[in-house]
């Protein structure tokens, strides 16, 4: 779950 960014999941 790399959703620690600003909603950036690619």
From Swiss-Prot:
The keyword Secreted applies. GO terms for molecular function: toxin activity. It is found in: Secreted. Expressed by the venom gland. One of its GO terms (cellular component) is extracellular region. Keywords: Secreted, Toxin. The keyword Secreted applies. This is Toxin To39.
